[in-house]
């Protein structure tokens, strides 16, 4: 699926071997969709042992592999305990500590559904305002990282199934035995908080448990059939079928195996950390100095080929439920190589179907500001957009038309994939049938820029189309066009 999966590591390994370096252990690869944590655990132990053997590190040096890598796949309740804590939770401080990020708080100004009433889906224009001063600076094309909260229903469902959770709102501190097992120390993974707060803001309760987590859970099953089934799911083939069919949340696992008696300390120590979600910023700070705009598709889907329970995207659902003035903990993440050209006279082609349009709104807002307030005339900026139907989900349609009238956008080309009685048209079709000469002129003749934003499958199809186009124009072989392509000013911001 990902054409450049682990590309940096693979390239580095090849180069090192070319330079006659000795490889201590096989290169490890981690796929977050397929047990990255377990893959790293196995690789780390193997590499550590290989390094000790190669460099003659003996036991007299008292070097040991940490228990978390060498211990068997069990969880021992006597190694953990909960103590009450008087410390109130400072959410921003806690999130900053857990994720090592400098957070700031924004407030929701408004939510606007960009789809028409004819659409069954929702894509939001999210307008956030800074608290107090202007706030941190950002550039068009950068991302806003948001720390969402899990759905209340999921959290409550888990709390109702925890065996030792009589006071879910009591602030507690998780303590663990030190390596020697002689005294208790505070676990640094989470700050003192209530179990409800941990499940809401800090812990990932929607990602399917790993095989290792299922193995640890099996000990809490009081029915033998449940324990055996959980053990069976630790086998790769069984696990992958179960995972990709059900994509279960942690609550759904507890519902599937109702005899599980899970203690609170297990949740606090074993559930993965809830990660921030990233969204392309859809505004220019020069154009809207005290605001950040986002373009957010509200994600809902059913598992089991449409027959399973309804699942909701964690962050998009959380955002959709916000009320005006609600706080939003966030931070800015720079995106290397996805900014407007330093030379504004250089032509650009922007390709962004669906919510892939998000960063390009910040581009045209910046160009509008530069034109109106700095007298800068930008080069040709051609936009290629795609959606299902012009009367349902053509995001920012009126704004695009306004940018054309004002000369900010040179042209807008749109492909629709769900027009009744007409063939599906995607952005790569437009490039091939309508813009082949313009693309070649911008990339080859004028050394301009081409930007692609959207999902990985679309980006792959666009890249394939462009390579064929360039190869035909310059009469290049497949290998030659690959080399040439890397020399072009070709920018991608893609997601899974």
Swiss-Prot record:
One of its GO terms (cellular component) is cytosol. Binds 1 FAD. GO terms for molecular function: calmodulin binding; metal ion binding; nitric-oxide synthase activity. It is found in: Cytoplasm, Cytosol. Its cofactor is heme b; FAD; FMN; (6R)-L-erythro-5,6,7,8-tetrahydrobiopterin. FAD binds at residues 143, 277, 279-280, 295, 297, 301, 314-316. Residues 101-341 form the FAD-binding FR-type domain. It catalyses: 2 L-arginine + 3 NADPH + 4 O2 + H(+) = 2 L-citrulline + 2 nitric oxide + 3 NADP(+) + 4 H2O. InterPro entries: CysJ-like_FAD-binding (IPR003097), FAD-bd_FR_type (IPR017927), Flavoprot_Pyr_Nucl_cyt_Rdtase (IPR001709), Flavoprotein-like_sf (IPR029039), FNR_nucleotide-bd (IPR039261), NADPH_Cyt_P450_Rdtase_alpha (IPR023173), NOS (IPR050607), OxRdtase_FAD/NAD-bd (IPR001433). Polyubiquitinated; mediated by SPSB1, SPSB2 and SPSB4, leading to proteasomal degradation. Signal peptide: none annotated. It comes from the Eukaryota. The keyword DNA-binding does not apply. Not stimulated by calcium/calmodulin. One of its GO terms (biological process) is peptidyl-cysteine S-nitrosylation. The keyword Protease does not apply. It is an enzyme of class 1 (oxidoreductase). Its EC number is 1.14.13.39. FMN binds at residues 6, 32, 36. Keywords: Calmodulin-binding, Cytoplasm, FAD, Flavoprotein, FMN, Heme, Iron, Metal-binding, NADP, Oxidoreductase, Ubl conjugation. Homodimer. Interacts with NHERF1. Interacts with GAPDH; induced by oxidatively-modified low-densitity lipoprotein (LDL(ox)). Interacts with S100A8 and S100A9 to form the iNOS-S100A8/9 transnitrosylase complex. Interacts with SPSB1, SPSB2 and SPSB4. Interacts with ELOC and CUL5 in the presence of SPSB1 or SPSB2 or SPSB4. Forms a complex with ASL, ASS1 and HSP90AA1; the complex regulates cell-autonomous L-arginine synthesis and citrulline recycling while channeling extracellular L-arginine to nitric oxide synthesis pathway. Belongs to the NOS family. Produces nitric oxide (NO) which is a messenger molecule with diverse functions throughout the body. In macrophages, NO mediates tumoricidal and bactericidal actions. Also has nitrosylase activity and mediates cysteine S-nitrosylation of cytoplasmic target proteins such PTGS2/COX2. As component of the iNOS-S100A8/9 transnitrosylase complex involved in the selective inflammatory stimulus-dependent S-nitrosylation of GAPDH implicated in regulation of the GAIT complex activity and probably multiple targets including ANXA5, EZR, MSN and VIM. This is Nitric oxide synthase, inducible.
């Amino acid at each position: 699926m990902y054409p450049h999966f682990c590309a940096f590591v693979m390239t580095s390994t090849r180069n090192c071997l070319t330079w006659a370096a000795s490889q201590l252990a096989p290169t490890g690869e981690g796929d977050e969709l397929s047990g990255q944590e377990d893959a790293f655990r196995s690789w780390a132990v193997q590499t550590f042992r290989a390094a000790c053997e190669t460099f003659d590190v003996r036991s007299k040096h008292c070097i040991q592999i940490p228990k978390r890598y060498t211990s068997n796949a069990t969880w021992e309740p006597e190694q953990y305990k909960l103590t009450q804590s008087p410390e109130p939770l400072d959410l921003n401080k806690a999130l900053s500590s857990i994720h090592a990020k400098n957070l700031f708080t924004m407030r929701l100004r408004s939510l606007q559904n960009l789809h028409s009433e004819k659409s069954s889906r929702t894509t939001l224009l999210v307008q956030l305002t800074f608290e107090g001063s202007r706030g941190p600076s950002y550039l068009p094309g950068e991302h806003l990282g948001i720390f969402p909260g899990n759905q209340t229903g999921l959290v409550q469902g888990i709390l109702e199934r925890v065996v030792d959770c009589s006071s879910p709102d009591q602030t507690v501190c998780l303590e663990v035995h030190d390596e020697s097992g002689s005294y208790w120390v505070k676990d640094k993974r989470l700050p003192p908080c209530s179990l409800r707060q941990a499940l809401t803001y800090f812990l990932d309760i929607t990602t399917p448990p790993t095989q290792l987590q299922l193995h640890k859970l099996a000990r809490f099953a009081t029915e033998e059939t449940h324990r055996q089934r959980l053990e069976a799911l630790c086998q790769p083939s069984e696990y992958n079928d179960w995972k990709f069919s059900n994509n279960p949340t942690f609550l759904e696992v507890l519902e599937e195996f109702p005899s599980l008696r899970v203690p609170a300390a297990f949740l606090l120590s074993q559930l993965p950390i809830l990660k921030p979600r990233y969204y392309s910023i859809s505004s220019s700070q020069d154009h809207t100095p005290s605001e950040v705009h986002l373009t957010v598709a509200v994600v809902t889907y059913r598992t089991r080929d449409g027959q399973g329970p309804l699942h909701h995207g964690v962050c998009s659902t959380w955002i959709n439920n916000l009320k005006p003035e609600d706080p939003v903990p966030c931070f800015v993440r720079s995106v290397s190589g996805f900014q407007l050209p330093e030379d504004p006279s250089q032509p650009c082609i922007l390709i962004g179907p669906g919510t892939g349009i998000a960063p390009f709104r910040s581009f045209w807002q910046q160009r509008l500001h530069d034109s109106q307030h700095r007298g800068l005339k930008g080069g040709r900026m051609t936009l290629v957009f795609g959606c299902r139907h012009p009367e349902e989900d053509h995001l920012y349609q009126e704004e695009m038309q306004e940018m054309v009238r004002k000369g900010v956008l040179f042209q807008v080309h749109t492909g629709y994939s769900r027009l009744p009685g007409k063939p599906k048209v995607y952005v790569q079709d437009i490039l091939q049938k309508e813009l082949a000469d313009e693309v070649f002129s911008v990339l080859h003749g004028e050394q301009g820029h081409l930007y692609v934003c959207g999902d990985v499958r679309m980006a792959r199809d666009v890249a394939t189309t462009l390579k064929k186009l360039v190869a035909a124009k310059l009469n290049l072989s497949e290998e030659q066009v690959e080399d040439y392509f890397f020399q072009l000013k070709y920018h991608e911001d893609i997601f899974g």
